[in-house]
Amino acid sequence: MRIAILGRPNVGKSSLFNRLCRRSLAIVNSQEGTTRDRLYGEIRAWDSIIHVIDTGGVDQESTDRFQKQIHQQALAAAEEASVLLLVVDIRCGITKQDEELAKRLLPLKKPLILVMNKADSQQDLQRIHEFYGLGISDMIATSASHDKHIDLLLERIRQIAQIPVPSVEEQDVVQEDELPSEEAAISLHAFADETLFENESLSQEEASFLEELVAQTATPAPVDRPLKVALIGHPNVGKSSIINALLKEERCITDNSPGTTRDNIDVAYTHNNKEYVFIDTAGLRKTKSIKNSVEWMSSSRTEKAISRTDICLLVIDATQQLSYQDKRILSMIARYKKPHVILVNKWDLMFGVRMEHYVQDLRKMDPYIGQAHILCISAKQRRNLLQIFSAIDDIYTIATTKLSTSLVNKVLASAMQRHHPQVINGKRLRIYYAIHKTTTPFTFLLFINSNSLLTKPYELYLKNTLKAAFNLYRVPFDLEYKAKPARKSN
């Protein structure tokens, strides 16, 4: 079931959306027009998921150049949803915009709840009777900012959705056999023939240390959910246009003015039976360019989108040089260790430029670009868009592939036989064995005799060996180490 939240500007729609979804997904600000696109969230309750759509404020008398598109997005959400919430400001009484919206929504013959928001006091509640004139019989007074009567609204939504209330026995009870079990401890003996130095026996102390560490190491199973893909870039590079072109519909408002997108917009899409969630983000600006709190929150939300996504699509403008913002975003993606693809948009404007030469020059402009997958596309002409799905799938397959312990150890054993670690104070680095610890982020864990024997050049050598062996050129990964505790002196 889908619920659409509609209303004129600044009546608290985004605050209500955040309360229902229990997350700050929509930017909340007293400035009118803060929300422009359709923003999607979820109510997770009663063992069910209800999808919620937040829309921009509809004001047909506004001179805002985005108002026509906001109006279209709101009406599209009303058509898409099965339940409608018309939000009004109880303190203002009925306005002309409220009346116009009610007239548009009532003929849709869908369950319609009038949410009289901002009922912060008992005095506000005395104005409920003023709204009978809208002709909507289902009415609930709320205060989203103070979390008042949201439970009543949720209960009404549950009734409309005909979701049964779980029995007391079913609520908040976790059966013992349903508790997540830790993965079985990896037996040291199972890998006795896979240690990197097969001909060297372990001392009893080393064996005990190794067995204890292995038993504590578990790798979580990959989550079965849609793949999250965030489109990142500085303002006006065409992020929203790319999503609209991929989906073949106007899901995100576009304009030539930088900063059109303010919220992070999650758009679900299925391609070749695979589920994706595209996250359209606000453009990341230079700090000096951020003029108000709404733009600051948008930039902050861009970083949050990077942190929660599976893959980043960095969108750059083919007609412009790689900017400071682009490099800042690249470093941010690297800091969060996210696989990424670089989309060079507006390629239709690059007359007489050879693509391979452009890509070669681009790789030299920033070390974080490295061997990243680069696609030259045109959202306007829908050129090379399907290659985006192929690039996403390829890189995600590599990034989520669980490597066998046997294979990882054989690769490292071969590397150490080719180039032995240097001797330091009469001792040499010893790797007992290694495992592929996690896929998100991609991490190897090496059990070694001492951190002091691992030099930076040799660590880089090991990392490059793993990168080449497992084709990790486009997947950021880390090496972690567990060293044997130093012997206690008597």
UniProtKB/Swiss-Prot annotation:
**Nucleotide-binding is among the record's keywords:** yes
Against InterPro entries, the record matches this protein to: G_ENGA (IPR031166), GTP-bd (IPR006073), GTPase_Der (IPR016484), KH_dom-like (IPR032859), KH_dom-like_a/b (IPR015946), P-loop_NTPase (IPR027417), Small_GTP-bd (IPR005225)
List of residues binding GTP 1: 7-14, 54-58, 117-120
Gene3D superfamilies in the cross-refs:
3.30.300.20, P-loop containing nucleotide triphosphate hydrolases
Q: Which domain of life is it from?
A: Bacteria
Domain KH-like stretches: 401-485
The UniProt keywords, alphabetically, are: GTP-binding, Nucleotide-binding, Repeat, Ribosome biogenesis
Q: Which family does it belong to?
A: Belongs to the TRAFAC class TrmE-Era-EngA-EngB-Septin-like GTPase superfamily. EngA (Der) GTPase family.
Subunit annotation: Associates with the 50S ribosomal subunit.
Q: What is this protein called?
A: GTPase Der
Q: List positions binding GTP 2.
A: 233-240, 280-284, 345-348
Q: Does the keyword Oxidoreductase apply?
A: no
Q: Molecular function (GO) terms listed?
A: GTP binding; ribosome binding
